[in-house]
Amino acid sequence: MDGYALFYLVGALRDGSVYRYSRNYYVIWYSSNKDYLERVIVSKLRILGFHNVRVYQYKRGAYRVRISSKQLFHILVNQFEHPLSTSSRKTPWPTPQRVKDGPLALQIEYVKGFVDAEGSVIKSSKGVQVDVSQQIMEPLKFLAQVLEKVGVKVTGIYLGSDGVWRLRIASLASLRRFAHYIGFRHPCKSKKLNELLGRPLPGPSKLKGIGGGAPQGVEPAA
């Protein structure tokens, strides 16, 4: 399987589920944005060889892509340690060891999927910020480590009054590096971030990173 597409889809499963029903092995990605699922999730699944894939509206304003694949199910459960979903509270999912052990380029694809699923762009009285939410802190600490490798400094990781952990990026320099190296493929989030940043993103030569330029082997977000 294509590693880039697979790692992205694993990250995007932060808003998804993996479960078995009778003899069927299901993997589902959710979003309130149909266009995102069609243009990004479906296209990456097709790269992995899943061609008979469609987006369904399962309730008002909510969409999903669901595939039945024993092979992908076992990859996600056995290699990426995804917990099996139940009807009860969602089980916390620490960062998979395979992701931790992977090369930086694949870790970045995982982060891209993660932020598309759980990231948000916020304009407040304090300025622009990107927040990434999660049930437990550990996955956000790993995200912070990867972001640091491309020169994105995280403002902090906070526990909200709602019991949800949030990673925050708030400095303009880090927001611009985030947009350049990670970014959003989710159309609404991408549009909002670029509009709030207010000017074209600089090229890699203008972004001081590891070694004074772009981190080795890391391409701009796509």
Swiss-Prot record:
GO terms for biological process: intron homing. InterPro entries: Homing_endonucl, LAGLIDADG_dom. Gene3D superfamilies: Homing endonucleases. Probably functions as a monomer. Optimum temperature is 90 degrees Celsius. Active from 70 to 90 degrees Celsius. One of its GO terms (molecular function) is endonuclease activity. Optimum pH is 7.5. Keywords: Endonuclease, Hydrolase, Intron homing, Nuclease. Its cofactor is Mg(2+); Mn(2+). This is Homing endonuclease I-ApeI. Its EC number is 3.1.-.-. It comes from the Archaea. The keyword Cell inner membrane does not apply. It is an enzyme of class 3 (hydrolase). Endonuclease involved in 16S rRNA intron I-alpha homing. Recognizes the minimal target 5'-GCAAGGCTGAAACTTAAAGG-3'; generates 4 base 3' protruding ends 5'-AAAC-3' and 5'-GTTT-3'. Pfam families: LAGLIDADG_3. 1-5 mM manganese gives higher cleavage activity than the same concentration of magnesium.
